[in-house]
Structure formats: structure tokens, C-alpha cells
Amino acid sequence: MTKNIGKITQIISAVVDVKFTNNGELPEILNALECYNDKQRIVLEVAQHIGDDTVRCIAMDSTEGLVRGVEVMDTGSPICIPVGTETLGRIMNVVGEPIDGKGDIKSSNISAIYKSAPDFTNQSTERNILVTGIKVVDLLAPYIKGGKIGLFGGAGVGKTVLIMELINNVAKAHGGYTVFAGVGERTREGNDLYHEMIDSGVIDLEKPENSKVALVYGQMNAPPGARARVALSGLTIAESFRDMNGGQDVLFFVDNIFRFTQAGSEVSALLGRIPSAVGYQPTLATDMGELQERITSTKHGSITSVQAIYVPADDLTDPAPATSFAHLDATTVLSRQIAEFGIYPAVDPLDSNSQVLDPMIVGEEHYSVARQVQQVLQTYKSLQDIIAILGMDELSEEDKLTVSRARKIQRFLSQPFHVAEVFTGSEGKFVNLADTIAGFKGLVEGKYDDLPEAAFYMVGTIDEAIEKAKILK
């Protein structure tokens, strides 16, 4: 078979035009092309056909130093990456090249990053709770095993810390495999996560086959093409783990889905497409749907996905986060107002929700306590204007009691994290679901009305709050 060779005719940032004149055959849309820039392999992905002999491509690596006239070869298939157990304990980039300095990834299994979602008949509809050990999440917006979970928040409210704590609490206790896709986030955070996983034993450097996690990075400094595709590369590895050996349960962490959308917007502008609302690509809903529909559970294995989603200017109606909402089973909304009070995790207990907060799934007691907690907090929120204008003295005795309980609940929703121990100096806490329900049930029923507010701040179980109250007295 003769190789289909073309030549670069134009380079504009991450967009490269390639002319094929040999036999008139143009590479298919989404095919991967290869060229070399100073002995470094660069992968280009076909995005458009221009005329009879030219294709417009998106570069997956920096185009600095690339010149017109360089030969480009059509690989005949989309971007393919190594999958399977050989990827465990390794860090790779969007095209499957190792970036951890540990040599090539010797995998006999290679898979294209574009696939169809499993058939409807093969998808699972089971709903089981995934206990995270984080009180506010487990009580008010519980996660689903095999579901899609979104962590929404503006800049600096704690999305990455929360995702790291979830990796710590869920991935370490989880028997199966974990895949982490770093999409357009800080290289330092990726490095911290890698070394933390080595320290905790999730990655075994001496025997990589004993590792439990594979990492795929396309960080902030990567070209838009890489950032737009790295989530698909990570998902391809997660799918391979899900389908191997008759089915596995896989955890798939993505930080950050907004950067995936942002990169798609950059690529779209470079390709000359007319932007839609707020400058996003006209294909925003399609791009999001193609990624999210593949993150699903089958009758044999599951993918539980936790996705951090940056909210520009704290506006949840922005098209990027708004497009994500429809695909998610549970949403955890992080609030700047709550972070300003020093309550961490800064999860908004009234904005966050979950499809499984249903008495048929979580049980009558859990559902009842969660709704009572939200009712107390909602009443307190509606009284805040009166308190601000007239003060606490003008409230009825019943309202004063509600405010007192709400403030205790707010503080009891805080929790010291394992991954933040070095910053807070407090030992991290994992709280079992039964302890969480029992603690909040006592609070809404008034069992702890005599304890000071400060006793409930940054503790795990209600017993710890009682002990703290004794010390404070």
C-alpha cells in the first residue's frame, strides 16, 4: 500500500493546511497525519477539506519551527493511543506518548480516541450510592456509582481540592482502576497529584503493573488541539478498563471540562467558524454530547465520572457550564459566599442536587433528614434580610431557634480534608453515611441546641463536635 504524502502549504498558529497532489485521495475527516519538526513527531488532525486537494488540520503539539514544504503522511486512521494495563502508573499526552520520562508504553492494544457510545440495550440503569465520606455531598447531593458528577465553581473556591479529596477517599478504597484526565489545568497541580499518588501507593514505580491509575495530561501550555482532545484520550483508556476481563468498575476524573469547551472555542475560531453565544463554538452542544454520552455504564462494567467545571464570572447560566448540566446525575455547586465565611468544602447546600436523593433509593430517613436540613437553611436565608435591617431581637422565638440551628448546620457542613492537612494543620476526616445522617438528624431535632456554634466547625462526626464543646466550655 502506497503512503499518502502531502506537503504543508500554510501555518496559522495551531491550524495547518496540507496539500495532497499524488493520487488525488484526501485523508478522511478526523484522520491523524504525521510530520516531523526537527526530529520531533507532530500529529495533525484533519478538520476540514478545502477544495479538491487541501485539508485543514489542527496540530496536537506546538507548531513553532514548522515550515511550509514539510512532508506530511496520512496514517489512515484517527489518533490512536495505547490502552490496557500497560498504561497504569504512567503519564501520557493526548497522542499516547509518555511524558513521565519512564520510557515507551509497551502495549499491544491500541485504540482510536473516537468511538460510539454503547447501545441503549447494553447500558445499565442500576442506581447505587457512592459514599464519598464528605458530609455535605453524601447527605444533600449523593453521588451515583456509574453516574456523572459535576463540581461547579468559579476561580479559587476549591474545585481541585475537592476532586483531590474524592480521589483520596474514593479511588484509594476503590478496588478497580482509575483514570485521571488533566484538561487545560496547571502543570504544578498535575505534578502534585502524581507525587501524591506515588506516596499513597496508588502508583507503584517499581512494579507499574500493581498501580491503580493511568494519567493523561494536556495542560494549560498545550495547544488548543491537544486540550480539545485529551479528555477523549482519557475516556478511551477508561472505556478499555471498563470492557476488559468481562467488565470492571472504573473511576474517571476530569479537571477541567470547561477547558475542553474553551479549547474547542479556540479551535473553532481558528477554523473560521462563526461563533455562537458569548463567543463559543456553534457546535458546543454537539461536542459536549459526544464526550458525555460515551461516559456510561454497561451491564458488565461501569464508569463513574467526576468532572470539575469552572464557572466563568460565577455565572451558572454561561453556555459552557449550562450545556453540562443536562448530562449530569449529580451537581455539586461551590459558592464563593460560603468560601468567604471560611466554610470548606464551600458546597452550596441549596444549589447542589442529585437525581438519587429519592426515598426509594436512599431510604426514608436519609431523604427526610436532607430535606429538613435544606428547609432550615432556606428559612435562615429568607430571614437574613430582616436580620440585616432590624437585627436578631425583632425575630420571633421560633425564628431565633431556626437561625441558631441553621448556623450550627452551616458549620457542621464543613469538614477537614486529608489532602489539605498541610495547609490547615487539622487531621482529615472520612465520615460514614450513617454517622452523617445521625449527626444532622440530631441537629434538626434540637438535641444539640445547648452546644456552642464553634463546636461544629471543622469536625467529622457529631461525637467530635460534643468533645470539642467540652473543651470550649
UniProtKB/Swiss-Prot annotation:
Pfam families: ATP-synt_ab, ATP-synt_ab_N, ATP-synt_VA_C. Its EC number is 7.1.2.2. Keywords: ATP synthesis, ATP-binding, Cell inner membrane, Cell membrane, CF(1), Hydrogen ion transport, Ion transport, Membrane, Nucleotide-binding, Translocase, Transport. ATP binds at G153, G154, A155, G156, V157, G158, K159, T160. One of its GO terms (cellular component) is proton-transporting ATP synthase complex. It comes from the Bacteria. PROSITE patterns: ATPASE_ALPHA_BETA. GO terms for molecular function: ATP binding; ATP hydrolysis activity; proton-transporting ATP synthase activity, rotational mechanism. It is an enzyme of class 7 (translocase). Coiled coil: none annotated. NCBIfam families: atpD. Produces ATP from ADP in the presence of a proton gradient across the membrane. The catalytic sites are hosted primarily by the beta subunits. Belongs to the ATPase alpha/beta chains family. F-type ATPases have 2 components, CF(1) - the catalytic core - and CF(0) - the membrane proton channel. CF(1) has five subunits: alpha(3), beta(3), gamma(1), delta(1), epsilon(1). CF(0) has three main subunits: a(1), b(2) and c(9-12). The alpha and beta chains form an alternating ring which encloses part of the gamma chain. CF(1) is attached to CF(0) by a central stalk formed by the gamma and epsilon chains, while a peripheral stalk is formed by the delta and b chains. This is ATP synthase subunit beta. The gene is atpD.
